[in-house]
């Protein structure tokens, strides 16, 4: 377990323990707000915005304050990354694009978003995991921030190589179809995405 990078323990009862060791840096932000506390707080904030996340069961400190452990229930589903690798036809690409759009509409900027962190719970429902690095806006995510955020998961070749079956551009187009703004804004967003994404 590296400092700042959690270790994951999956228990037989399908619950998970996520373990963080405090960074040794004197001025690390984790000293003021430990990652485990951010995880718990973000889970609460995401749930308040009707986003499915794991249910938090417990938060503990071990060895003074140097180690924090969050115990939570595992989401019942499969990551988009695993589905793309094994059953790509099971990925509802249209609903996935709508899901990304809904996060942005709700003012949620999931900085670490990639297809390994998005769980397909059913054909029409998704959930998030590993959301420690999330920023919440009071309104909708601005256009430029949407473009940068949406391009993030498309940088992972292990995912996009599988997504080519359905088409990376198709995923972007499906997202753009949700964007009910002026055509000028739509074109601008598409241009930014094409410059950032490995399409």
Language-model regions: role of each:
Residues 1-75, 101-106:
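Conserved ATP-binding subdomain of kinase catalytic cores across diverse folds
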């Amino acid at each position: 377990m590296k400092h700042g990078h959690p270790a994951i323990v999956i228990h037989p009862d399908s619950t998970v323990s996520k373990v963080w060791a405090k960074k040794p840096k004197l001025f690390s932000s984790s000293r003021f707000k430990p990652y485990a506390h951010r995880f718990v707080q973000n889970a609460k904030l995401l749930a308040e915005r009707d986003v499915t996340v794991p249910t938090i069961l417990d938060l503990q400190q071990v060895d003074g304050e140097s180690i924090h452990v969050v115990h939570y229930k595992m989401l019942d589903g499969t990551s988009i990354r695993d589905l793309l690798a094994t059953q790509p036809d099971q990925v509802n690409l249209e609903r996935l694009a709508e899901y990304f759009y809904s996060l942005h509409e709700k003012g949620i900027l999931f900085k670490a978003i990639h297809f390994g962190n998005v769980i397909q719970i059913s054909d029409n429902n998704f959930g998030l995991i590993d959301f420690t690095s999330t920023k919440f806006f009071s309104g909708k995510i601005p256009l430029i921030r949407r473009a940068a955020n949406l391009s993030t998961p498309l940088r992972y070749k292990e995912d996009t190589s599988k997504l080519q079956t359905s088409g990376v551009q198709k995923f972007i187009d499906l997202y753009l179809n949700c964007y009910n703004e002026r055509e000028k804004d739509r074109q601008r967003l598409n241009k930014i995405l094409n410059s950032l994404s490995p399409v």
